[in-house]
Amino acid sequence: MPKIKKVSYILAIVLSVIYLLWRVFFAIPWHAHIFTLIFALLLVGSEIFSSFTAYVLIIFRLIRADKTQKLEIPEFDLQQPIPKIDVIIVTHNEEVSLLRKTVNAATFMDYPDKSKVNIVISDDGNRPEVRELAKEYQVNYVTMEKNKHAKAGNINNALEQLDAPLFAILDADMMPFSNFLTSSVPFFTENFAELEENPDHTKPIGFVQTPQSFYNADIFQFNLFLQDAVVNEQDFFSRDVNVLNGSNGHALFTGSNAVFLREIVDKVGGFPTDTITEDFELGTKINSEGYISIATREPVSSGITPVDIKSVIKQRTRWARGVIQSCRNMHIFTNPKITLLNRIILINTWLYWWSFSRRLIYIAAPLLYALFKVQVVNANFWILMIVWAPGYFLLHFVLGDTSSNIRNERWGESRKLSLLHICLFQLFWNQSGSKLRNLR
């Protein structure tokens, strides 16, 4: 990274911190009406948490820039044993025509010894037509009579009948490219060799997460006819943020397109069944046992993202409530098994879902002043501009620079704002301890 860019990144944080210190010590209306004071404190808290999430991204970019930019996929060392791998295609009630595409794509995956690739359709619906599909493509079929634990139960049932040292998880709609295995398994074979040579200074890899990629337009691209103008809304996390997480050894598991070391999944008790986001919680458990996780940047599979509002609401509700629920299950603030870096990543993920409530506060603050003359910042306009503007604009310039061409910040904020009403109630409801199983 060029030195001038590093200076701008650091300066953005310094100016932003100066502004926040001014806000806390000089701009809170302590003698105002109780309602005004409470809202002013909520606004300051929102600004602090928003800045924290930005600082994490910028600092990770500063200290890990070279590592993420030079992330290279190792090649198979044919002098080393090629491990067996189970490829589990998870299905519940998806159409067979959709599942057929994924199964067909899986049969064309490259591997040095294809006899060591075991493709399995794990169908908790026990459907005869899916069984016939497995026979047609000469892959294995696993089913169960009654599944009480949704996707996690389906995968756990399949794992009980499999024994390869590695396994991959694919959703029913997620078609793997031919290089899916050759872009993920070599990380493990290289790690196995390093563990043999230097076990005291090498951490084992628990899983490798490849990006979530979609061949259809997302709900925003589709309805606003912006397929060629903006990228898919999930690209920024999958191909940027999670790669940064992985550069620190703590990539998040996002539910599909990942390859796992079987022994650590068994060690943590399989896929968690007491959460609606078993993916997020499983990845956290694996990291808490001292195993690292890696995220790659280039897509090696492609699936379908929902484009109707009903499906999007259900999806985001499940994500929001599930992450909050899993963070509570894992005690991310106090769990001694979670390292400092991993804790920062998890807290940052937790705070992301609370960003919807922060946006509501940001919208309300100027409206309160415009309509009711409620002043929640104890400062005149020009002092506010002098202290706030330099840090704000430089910070947002830096955030835009760190996102490269994967993310447009303005579109990102617009998308989040449109989902505010969907997620806000769910967050408060689930933070109180309530659960919602039928979102699976």
What does each of the following model-derived ranges do?
Residues 274, 284-301:
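Catalytic donor-sugar/metal-binding loop of nucleotide-sugar-dependent glycosyltransferases
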Residues 83-86, 118, 281:
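Cell-envelope/extracellular polymer assembly enzymes that use nucleotide-activated donors
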Residues 145-160, 164, 178-276, 287-288, ...:
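Long helical/loop segments within the catalytic core of UDP-sugar-dependent glycosyltransferases
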Residues 1-79, 134, 356-359:
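N-terminal membrane-anchoring/stem segments of glycan-assembly enzymes
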Residues 18-47, 352-437:
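Membrane-embedded multi-pass helical conduit in multi-pass membrane proteins
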Residues 102-116, 191:
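Short, acidic, metal-binding catalytic loop of nucleotide-sugar glycosyltransferases
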Residues 167:
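Short aromatic/hydrophobic "clamp" motif used to bind/position activated sugar donors
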